[in-house]
Regions:
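Helix-rich terminal scaffold detector
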Residues: 86, 92-206, 214-217
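Short, glycine/charged-enriched hinge/interface segments at domain edges or termini
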Residues: 2-33, 42-138, 267-268, 284-285, ...
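Glycine-rich, charged/polar anion/phosphate-binding loops
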Residues: 52, 80-87, 190-193, 230, ...
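Proline/glycine-rich low-complexity loops and linkers
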Residues: 169-266
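C-terminal terminal segments
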Residues: 4, 45, 54, 60, ...
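Structural beta-strand/beta-sheet cores of well-ordered domains, especially the beta-sheet scaffolds
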Residues: 41, 63, 75-76, 94, ...
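Predominant activation on well-ordered alpha-helical scaffold segments within soluble catalytic domains
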Residues: 18-22, 63, 77-81, 121-128, ...
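Short, glycine-/Ser/Thr-/acidic-enriched flexible segments
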Residues: 103-104, 166-167, 209-212, 249, ...
Length: 309
């Protein structure tokens, strides 16, 4: 990125963050030829044409069944089988490295002054579901040489995601030395400490350690980035209407995402930024910046962030 690097107090909107990251999301040109039996969720690299006529479906030989960029569903592969298609040329899934960072972070069996790493591990599962080919790394201690090696190691991937970081820490300084920092903060809550950088033309997403904040940052930034690299359609999460049984308390200066538990048509706001809060959430309510908080009895739209794709 051109220009002087921003200070750790600079902040960008979510729309700006998406635009900056999206400018690097050139669809991968790597392809695989795969059997139809494992094609669900994949994105054809070329138009898919019929080898056989399908009676009653108005599809003849050499007709286009699905255009390039269509993400295949289970019913789609059934139609392709009827059209005599047995294998497909698909785009390879974009490669994403997820690297947890921080002192005292372990994979299992945390001792005194240690904690089990969960934010990066959870994000790895989401990234896989969103179409990424994930490399999940062991946690890297808060040591500049070790962090530098960790970032450089994964620059062969399309995207690098680092968790456990905040403005002004050792990792942010290392990333600034290696490349260009776009911003140290994004105007979202939770997750305002989310940072963006570019190192050797690779987008780098810097997420907080909090499971809820990391999840918000990943859903809002990593998911659309993966779809861009994969040339896959980016669809909105499904929503349902619900009535709040308690008022929301958010910062009007930023766009807020509030986890809620659903009981029928009633939504109960959940407090906290720990793993249990993220797990108990049945959906999320978005409160745009500048808008008043919805109160008890108000009807809100609840997004299902666990919906596939």
């Amino acid at each position: 990125m051109a220009g002087a690097p921003p200070t750790d107090v600079e902040e960008c909107t979510l729309e700006t963050a998406r635009r900056e990251l999206g400018s690097y999301a050139v669809p991968v040109d790597r392809t695989d030829r795969i059997p139809l039996s494992v094609a669900v969720g994949r994105v054809p690299a070329t138009d898919t044409t019929a080898n056989n006529r399908i009676p009653g479906a108005d599809i003849g030989v050499d007709d286009t069944v699905f255009e390039r960029g269509h993400q295949l569903r289970p019913a789609d592969v059934g139609l392709l089988k009827a059209a005599g298609v047995s294998e497909l040329l698909v785009r390879q899934r974009p490669q994403v490295a997820i690297v947890p960072t921080g002192d005292g972070v372990v994979e299992y069996d945390a001792g005194p002054e240690e904690r089990v790493e969960t934010a990066g591990f959870t994000l790895a599962q989401y990234a896989d579901r969103w179409g990424g080919k994930v490399t999940y790394r062991n946690a890297v201690a808060d040591d500049a040489p070790a962090l530098r090696m960790a970032v450089q190691r994964d620059l062969t991937r399309d995207i690098v995601v680092l968790t456990g970081t905040e403005p002004g820490d050792t990792l942010r300084a290392v990333v600034r030395e290696l490349g260009d920092t776009v911003t140290d903060r994004v105007a979202i809550s939770p997750g305002r400490e989310t940072g963006l950088a570019v190192v050797q033309n690779r987008p780098v997403l810097l997420l907080p350690e909090s499971p809820v904040a990391a999840r918000v940052g990943a859903v809002q930034l990593l998911r659309p980035l993966l779809k861009g690299f994969g040339d896959a359609p980016f669809s909105a999460h499904p929503t349902r209407e619900a009535t709040l049984d308690g008022a929301l308390d958010t910062d009007r200066a930023v766009r807020s995402f509030v986890p809620v538990a659903l009981d029928g048509e009633t939504a109960t706001p959940l407090s906290g930024t720990d793993l249990a809060t993220a797990t108990r959430a049945d959906g999320w309510v978005t409160v745009p910046d500048g808008e008043a908080n919805p109160g008890a009895g108000d009807t809100v739209s609840v997004e299902d962030w666990d919906y596939l794709p």
